[in-house]
A protein has these predicted regions:
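Bacterial N-terminal signal peptides
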Residues: 8-17
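Short glycine- and acidic-rich boundary segments immediately preceding or forming the N-terminal edge
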Residues: 28-84, 445
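Metallocarboxypeptidase
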Residues: 72, 84, 140-142, 248-474, ...
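Active-site/substrate-binding loop(s) of hydrolase catalytic cores
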Residues: 98-99, 113-117, 121-321
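Short amphipathic, basic-aromatic surface patches that mediate peripheral association
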Residues: 485-499
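Intrinsically disordered, low-complexity Pro/Gly/Ser/Thr-rich segments with frequent PxxP/GP/PP motifs
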Residues: 517-545
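Short, aromatic- and glycine-rich surface loops/edge beta-strands on solvent-exposed regions
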Residues: 548-557
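Edge beta-strands of extracellular beta-sandwich domains
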Residues: 559-572
């Protein structure tokens, strides 16, 4: 199967199992119950672009009400179609005042539309209910990282993982000329199947227990494939392939540098080739105050913790998280489950993802949140026939959800159509978005569930305190100076991976004066990493004039400069104080 067709099946139409139109000899489907369905299927109710900007403006206005100045919107990049990619800065607005910060990102694609709702809900709750937290912690939030994909998905009612880059997927000199097309006129892109004619390779069978399901033949059980399966579309370019040159593009979560999947059709021509990805990368590079990050979307590292300690062929690069950081990430996963009560979540391949780039290239404590999975189907009504056992339990479970929770709205019954190239085909299957994205009502519920975790993770920060500088005379103008630096916070100053990559600036202690007067100890000391609750002790032997004092400064990426003065006993000394956060 062509690479783009595989990609389309895996992402755009990940919502679709496949079956045949009902015939008289088919076993009856489970009875459709009149239930309180959780609202219209996605993308109904979702918004993008200008509507998202309006919601961000409302958050800023609320945060800045009553004479406060706690929020602003900045443009950090422009999409390929010219749409602004915006970040909202929530908390202290004086950029010269250094504080720890958390990064929130959503809207990386047009498949998981709920991620933007999760970011916006978190922002609303933080500005409304966590005023004290915002005095000591900044929040940077990007609600729509890939606005073009989100807008296309909503407007076309078809999931789209990629941005608007034009790509000649099938290398025929034409761009995006053979995208999926609506054959039966129902306004949706679903699937087509047909009995494989002579000379073609059949791959699937119609399930004997439930004819709505078309599944791969189980050759180990002697099944013989009878059907071909396609994404709904036409062979516009006459190359014998259907829907293989779809619109776009590059998936942003395959475009980042860590484990960049260079041969994937949706990875882009090179790492961070896309303006959306580069805009995020530059923003992160320019904000070394970021200590933690949550990327909402198709990935999950909290419910399904990636426990692997494997490294790549160099034996240096972790496939997911560095083993030495696992305890920290496990603690975050536990916090997530306790905060949200979510025990199941979908996920996706992390290769080339933003979350792994943040964690392994930037040294930020970064996690991925999805939280969405197949809903539970209500029990069958009393007296209803028991559900039949099919050859594909997962597809049958989704059918049960459609039948019992959505009143059958999740599945488009197969109908016979005359295809201009294939002849007689059946068109139908699960509706786009049904399996990949919650309804807007479900997304709002999910956002309420994940917001407490955002607030609790924001409370996990390093906090540097510096003791008073103690001066002890030795003799002949020589003094000893002692100082202690402590991390009284709940997070290390950087991850162990951050210490290795050295992308997060270290904490720097500097003895002010002529370096040649520092006779023992280093005039400049660096703390690459300080665990939560840990302390470092420092001593210097310094040559001073009679009665003179010595100043030591402590500088870090997420606290204002701290100055301590070591003075003779007759002079006033400053007590140790906590670093501004």
């Amino acid at each position: 199967m062509h690479a783009r067709l595989k990609f389309t099946l895996a992402t755009m139409l990940m919502t679709l199992p496949f079956s045949s139109s009902t015939r008289a000899d088919d076993p009856p489907a489970a009875p459709v119950a009149a239930t309180n369905a959780p609202g219209a299927l996605a993308p109904n109710g979702y918004s993008s672009g200008e509507a998202t900007h309006v919601r961000l403006v409302a958050i800023v206005q609320s945060a800045n009400s009553e004479g406060r100045s706690r929020a602003r919107i900045e443009r950090i990049a422009t999409s390929r179609r010219g749409t602004a990619i915006e970040v909202i800065v929530l908390g202290e607005q004086d950029s010269t005042k250094k504080q720890p910060a958390m990064l929130l990102v959503g809207g990386m694609d047009g498949v998981d539309l709920a991620s933007t709702e999760q970011v916006l809900a978190a922002l609303n709750t933080l500005q409304r209910d966590h005023a004290e937290l915002l005095k000591t912690m900044r929040i940077y939030a990007i609600a729509e990282a890939n606005p073009d994909a989100r807008a296309d998905a909503i407007n076309s009612h078809t999931p789209r993982a990629t941005n608007a880059r034009e790509v000649d997927d099938d290398r025929d000199g034409a761009i995006d000329e053979d995208a999926p097309r609506d054959i039966n006129g129902d306004g949706l892109i679903t699937s087509m199947r047909r009995v494989a004619p002579a000379g073609r390779s059949a791959t699937h069978v119609v399930d004997a227990a439930d004819a709505r399901i078309t599944r791969a033949a189980k050759k180990d059980k002697g099944e013989v494939a009878t059907h071909e399966l396609f994404v709904e579309g036409l062979d516009i370019d006459g190359d014998g392939l259907l829907s293989e040159d779809a619109l776009g593009g590059v998936a942003l979560d395959h475009n980042f540098a860590h484990r960049y999947p260079e041969f994937a059709v949706d990875a882009g021509p090179y790492q961070m080739s896309e303006p959306e990805a580069m805009g995020i990368a530059r923003f992160v590079r320019d904000h070394s105050d970021i200590v933690s990050a949550i990327v909402f979307g198709r990935h999950d590292t909290l419910v399904n913790f990636p426990d692997t300690k494997d490294k790549d062929s160099t034996s240096r690069t972790p496939m997911c998280y560095l083993a030495e950081d696992h305890d920290m990430y496990r603690a975050m996963a536990k916090l997530f489950k306790e905060s949200t009560k979510l025990e199941k979540s979908d996920s996706a391949d992390l290769a080339g993802s933003l979350v792994l780039w943040l964690a392994n290239h930037r040294g930020i404590a970064a996690v991925a949140v999805n939280g969405w999975t197949r809903p539970l189907a209500p029990d069958l009504a009393e007296g209803a026939p028991a559900a039949v056992e099919t050859g594909d339990a997962d597809e049958a479970a989704w059918l049960a959800v459609s039948d019992r929770l959505y009143g059958g709205a999740g599945f488009d019954a197969w109908t016979t159509e005359q295809h201009p190239k294939l002849g007689v085909v059946e068109v139908g299957g699960f509706l786009p978005f049904f399996k990949s994205c919650p309804t807007i009502a479900q997304a709002e519920t999910l956002a309420v569930a994940t917001t407490p975790f955002v607030a609790k993770l924001a409370e996990l920060t390093p906090r540097i305190t510096v003791s008073d500088a103690r001066l002890t005379p030795i003799s002949n103008g020589l003094v000893r100076i002692d100082l202690r630096v402590t991390n009284t916070g709940t997070l290390a100053t950087t991850t162990e991976m951050g210490r290795i990559t050295q992308m997060i600036p270290p904490i720097v202690l500097r003895v002010i004066g002529n370096p040649s007067d520092v006779l023992s100890g280093k005039a400049i000391e660096k703390i690459e990493r300080l665990e939560a609750g840990a302390s470092n002790e420092y001593s210097w032997t310094v040559r001073v004039q009679d009665g003179a004092s010595v100043q030591i400064t402590v500088i870090g990426p997420n606290f204002d400069t701290i100055t301590r003065t070591a003075a003779p006993a007759s002079s006033a000394t400053q007590p140790g104080t906590e670093a501004p956060r």
